[in-house]
Every structure is written in C-alpha cells, then in structure tokens.
Amino acid sequence: MLQTSIKKIHGKLKGSNLNTAEVIVNSFKRAEQVLELNSFISMNNNAGLQVESSNEYFKNGKPRSLLEGIPIAVKDNFCVKDTLTTCGSKMLQNFRPKYTATVVQKLLDSGAILVGKTNMDEFAMGSGTTTSIFGPTKNIWGSRFSNLCIQEKNDWFIPGGSSGGSAVAVASGICLGALGSDTGGSCRNPASYCGIVGLKPTYGLLSRYGLIPLVNSMDVPAIMALNVEDTACLLGIMMGRDENDSTTVSKNLNLALNYSSSSVKGLKIGIPAEYNCQGLSDEIRSAWNDIAKVLYQGGASIVPVSMPHTKYSIVCYSILNQCEVASNMARYDGIEFGLRSKEKGNRKNSYVTTRYSGFNEVVRSRIIAGNFFLLSSNSNKYYEKALKVRRLIADDFNNAWRKGINILLTPTTLTDAPKYSEYIKKDEREQSAIQDYCTQPANMAGCPAISIPIELSKKGFPISLQLMAPKFEEKTLLGCALYIENAVNFKNMNEQ
C-alpha cells in the first residue's frame, strides 16, 4: 500500500476507498515486519488520536492538505513535544522536549500522521547509521526483505547516514515521507544507498527551530520520499519564514510541476570535472555519462565546468564542522538537561564523567579536534583559513551560475551501498572524507541539492546521481529531477 505516491493514497482516502486507520495500521504492521532493520528508535503511541482527527476532516469533506492521513517519520534529532528525542545518544536518552520543531508542526498541522522517530548516527555524526546507542540500522536492499537476499549472517549492507533510519523507513514502505537532516550529505547519502529521493533545500528555506544543532551554518532539514512529486509536496508545506529562526527567509516558491510532461529543453547542465574523483566506481561513472546523454537528448546543453576548490572542500568542511560541534556540544554539561553523572565530588569531576560517559568516541573526538582548531594560537591557521576557503568554494558555485549553468550533475556517492564489515574498517573521520566528498560542497555553498535513484548496480543495489542548483531554484531542480525520474523509471523496492 505504501509503495505508491502521496497523491494516489490521498485520492483513495478522499474517495472513501480507503480510510486513515487502514493506512496507519498497514504502516505499523510493516514496521513490525521489518523490525530487525532497526529503522526506528521509538513509535508514536498517540497515532490513534491523529487518525481520529484525520477521519473527521475527510468525513467533513475538508482534508487539510494532500498529507491528510499520510504516515510520515521524523529523524530523532527533531524535537517533538513530550516525545523522546535522543539524537541516538546516551546523553539524551531520556530527553523529552517541551516544544515541537517548526517543520514537524507544519506537517502535523497539514494532517500528516507521525509514525515514529527514526534511528541515526549519534548526534548526526556519521555516514552509515552505525553509531546509535540503539544499534545500527540495516539497509533493506540485500536483506531478506528484498528480492535479492545477499546479506550474510552477522553482516549487512549499510543504509548510509546519518539519516539512515528515515531512508529505510521510506524504502521499506513504512511511510510515504520522512524528515532527515543534512549537514554534509546526511540525507542524500542514505537516499542514494536506499534507492529513494533525498532533497537538501536551500539553506534558510526551511526552519531549523527544533532541530538539535550539529553545525548551525550548514544544518538543513531535509526531505526523503519515494519520488520527486512527493518530495515537492512535502517541501511546499514546510517552507517559509519562521520568527523562531532568524536564518529563514520569506520565499513562496512556485513548485507547481508538470508531472506528465516535464521538460529540460533549454537548460544548461554543468558537469564538474572535479567530481570524477579517485574511488568513483565505473558503474556510477557510466550512469553519470548516460544521464548526461538523456538530458542532452531532451534538449538540454551539456557543458563541462571546473570547480577548482572542490579538492579542498572536504578538509575545510571537516575543520568547520568540528569547530561548530565543539561549541554546540558544550551545552551538554549534566546540569540543565540530559544525562548527569552520579560521580560524587566537585562540579568539574561531574562534568568530565558526564561528557565521557554520555558521548561516544566519534563525538568526543570531534569535540577535541574542534577545541584544538579554536585555540587562540591555532584559530587563524585553521578556523579562519577554513572560512576563507569556504568562501572560495561558494564562489566556484556562483561562477558556474553566472555562466548560465542551471543545474550541476554529479554523483551522490562514490559506490553503491557497502557491507557493514567493510565500512567499519575505516573510522568515521576517514569515512566522512569518502562518503561526503560529492555532497558536502552544496552545504558549504548553501545551495539546494537532490539525490535521485537511476538504476541498479551489477550486485542489485541502487545507483543514484545528484543535481545541484542556484539558491532558491528548487523548482528548476525538482523539474530536472522529475525529467530524469520519468526517463529512467526506477522501480522501488517492492516493484523490483
């Protein structure tokens, strides 16, 4: 039931061919069936109340939006009032916020029904959804729930991260849409590995209020769905100015797309040479070339472009990430909220033991590195220099836009989903340099980017590509993505 579009389910609900209770029961049953994938940290025990409310709107013939009665999932770093919001960390394992994140509230006010909170890397620091205190999430592709089970005992394929729980929830048919967050690719990476659509909107288009921060200058609420149309629907509901987030802008983007006859005629598509990098698989390189041909045949012009500072981007991103992490993590001191050590003695000892026991090694290492970069003797060598390089990276994008480029076409990830046993051979810092190579520049520049599935690899796993566009050009971005989606006709998990 939930491997179709929001519009189709809404039509059945509106036409009384289906009721909200059936949809949500189906969602929870599916979650139970694939429980071992560990995509959720907690389920919403109050979903029944939302179902009753939604049914009333349908009975009165006044559904609030296309999302009325539609099941959604939310990554566990978005606050939901009086609901466990853990960030996958021991530090917040009992934290229940007193307010709801703006983007979540907009979804709920539009009639969407929250199924649960999804698993994630601890504090969103990771690219595999392998570091949560609730255990790792497993990719449905290659599992016993897929048509091609090649998962070995005590091993599996990672879903990507850090929003892997949301990606698996959508890919496995538990919900029709999910919220993730994207700081350096945390939505697009798992979307790529799980064969779904993942959108990182322009920085400032969606409110960050209620999103527990990782890197304030790059964090963006992100959208995961089965198709481009559903992605646009979710974006349209959540975007807009929020007085609780000073970085948001008043932009009412027209996202109306012609879903039956999308076109790329006249678009100028840039192919950045620097993304043809070491480690890029031949299969993804081939898919990249094939889609460039598809766009050319559709009337777009294909233009080679250079983004010369891309090679510095991952190092620059790493430094800025760790500096902001060190600042943001300082609030978890065991005094105001979160875990508090039972260590007796002075406040300093309590502070140290709280943070040591509350954070995993990945988080602690980023805090230490960030504080090192921010030392007065080091700040100008690392932090300030990284800020300057970030400006040069943003200028690379701006130069492309000034030359008339409408869309940049690149890989999302360098390979298809790796096995867990292979992934953990490198630590998270090394993996970040690999997994985020193609995705984090868009966060550095603040521009929108989308990952869309293209085809299956030889081993039967999704291969995806990324599109990037100028700030607030989401309509162009989604339109181009829709054209590719229609051209490749990628089949989701249950359609394979």
Swiss-Prot record:
The keyword Transport does not apply. It catalyses: L-glutamyl-tRNA(Gln) + L-glutamine + ATP + H2O = L-glutaminyl-tRNA(Gln) + L-glutamate + ADP + phosphate + H(+). InterPro entries: Amidase, Amidase_dom, AS_sf, GatA. The active site is at 75 (charge relay system), 162 (charge relay system), 186 (acyl-ester intermediate). It is an enzyme of class 6 (ligase). GO terms for cellular component: glutamyl-tRNA(Gln) amidotransferase complex; mitochondrion. It is found in: Mitochondrion. Disulfide bonds: none annotated. Pfam families: Amidase. Its EC number is 6.3.5.7. GO terms for molecular function: ATP binding; glutaminyl-tRNA synthase (glutamine-hydrolyzing) activity. GO terms for biological process: glutaminyl-tRNAGln biosynthesis via transamidation; mitochondrial translation. Keywords: ATP-binding, Ligase, Mitochondrion, Nucleotide-binding, Protein biosynthesis. The keyword Oxidoreductase does not apply. Subunit of the heterotrimeric GatCAB amidotransferase (AdT) complex, composed of A, B and C subunits. PANTHER family: GLUTAMYL-TRNA(GLN) AMIDOTRANSFERASE SUBUNIT A, MITOCHONDRIAL, TRANSAMIDASE. Allows the formation of correctly charged Gln-tRNA(Gln) through the transamidation of misacylated Glu-tRNA(Gln) in the mitochondria. The reaction takes place in the presence of glutamine and ATP through an activated gamma-phospho-Glu-tRNA(Gln). Belongs to the amidase family. GatA subfamily. This is Glutamyl-tRNA(Gln) amidotransferase subunit A, mitochondrial. It comes from Pediculus humanus subsp. corporis (Body louse). The lineage of its organism: Eukaryota, Metazoa, Ecdysozoa, Arthropoda, Hexapoda. The gene is gatA.
